[in-house]
């Protein structure tokens, strides 16, 4: 499977994909707005094959911690800051939605890769 095909899959699922340059290779930055309007993105780091790219997306899903991410968007009183929703529950739900967006991207990639 070609990397260009994987980029098209992401773009057809509302992701914006940007190429990134690293000292040890190229990677991709996947960006998309969360339901609450956060400009959410994940970076793959360098990869050399479609399989490595898919594994990188899976790893981002495994490592994503919605609770920790939500905490970053809360002030010292537990309310949203920097444009995040005011209520803690809403911030957490938005971060959980971001986690699901990563998972859904991985599933699209896995399914497409297995069909090839």
PLM regions: where:
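Negatively charged, low-complexity tracts enriched in Asp/Glu with abundant Ser/Thr
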Residues: 1-39, 114-116
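Intrinsically disordered, low-complexity regulatory regions enriched in serine/threonine/proline
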Residues: 39-116
């Amino acid at each position: 499977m070609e990397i260009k095909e994987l980029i098209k899959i992401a773009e057809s699922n509302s992701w914006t994909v940007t190429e990134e340059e690293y000292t040890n290779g190229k990677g991709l930055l996947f960006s998309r707005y969360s339901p609450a309007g956060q400009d959410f993105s994940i970076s793959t780091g360098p990869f050399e094959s479609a399989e490595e790219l898919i594994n990188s997306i899976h790893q981002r899903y495994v490592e994503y911690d919605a609770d920790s991410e939500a905490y970053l968007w809360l002030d010292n009183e537990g309310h949203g800051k920097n444009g995040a929703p005011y209520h803690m529950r809403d911030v957490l739900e938005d971060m959980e939605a971001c986690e699901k967006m990563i998972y859904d991207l991985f599933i699209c990639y896995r399914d497409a890769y297995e069909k090839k």
